[in-house]
Amino acid sequence: MAAVSLSVSTVKPLGDRVFVKVSASEKRPRRLYFPDTAKEKPQVGEVVALGAGKRNDDGSRQELEVKVGDLLLYSKYAGTDVKLGTEEYVLLSEKDILAMVG
């Protein structure tokens, strides 16, 4: 089996999934209040890659509401955590996104 080298540019989310770079707590927007319990696991991140969108019953794609570069607030235990080098990412379904920030 050949070794696969993962980087942000090689990760292509499928369907309605969104690949998000997790923001360090000190980079969080100051205008948002996060209770102490939310500081355990970051819930804010920047979109770095998108899937093509959810497939509808008729075969067409439903466009995602977010775009690369958007800052998001997402569910605390949502998605799959991915570490590439020293950076942390999370692969989310669009339904796990709570809000766009900024």
Curated annotation (Swiss-Prot):
GO molecular function per UniProt: ATP binding; metal ion binding; protein folding chaperone; protein-folding chaperone binding; unfolded protein binding
InterPro entries registered for this protein in UniProt: Chaperonin_GroES (IPR020818), Chaperonin_GroES_sf (IPR037124), GroES-like_sf (IPR011032)
Biological process terms in GO annotation: chaperone cofactor-dependent protein refolding
Keyword Lyase: no
Pfam family, one: Cpn10
Localization per record: Cytoplasm
Main location: cytoplasm
Gene Ontology CC annotations of this record: cytoplasm
Domain of life: Bacteria
SUPFAM superfamilies per the UniProt record, alphabetical: GroES-like
Keywords in alphabetical order: Chaperone, Cytoplasm
Chaperone recorded as keyword: yes
Assembly information from the UniProt record: Heptamer of 7 subunits arranged in a ring. Interacts with the chaperonin GroEL.
NCBIfam families referenced in this protein's UniProt entry, alphabetically: PRK00364.1-6 (NF001530), PRK00364.2-2 (NF001531)
Similarity field: Belongs to the GroES chaperonin family.
Job of this protein: Together with the chaperonin GroEL, plays an essential role in assisting protein folding. The GroEL-GroES system forms a nano-cage that allows encapsulation of the non-native substrate proteins and provides a physical environment optimized to promote and accelerate protein folding. GroES binds to the apical surface of the GroEL ring, thereby capping the opening of the GroEL channel.
PANTHER family: 10 KDA HEAT SHOCK PROTEIN, CO-CHAPERONIN GROES
Entry-linked HAMAP family: CH10 (MF_00580)
Protein's recorded name: Co-chaperonin GroES
Species whose genome carries this gene: Anabaena sp. (strain L31)
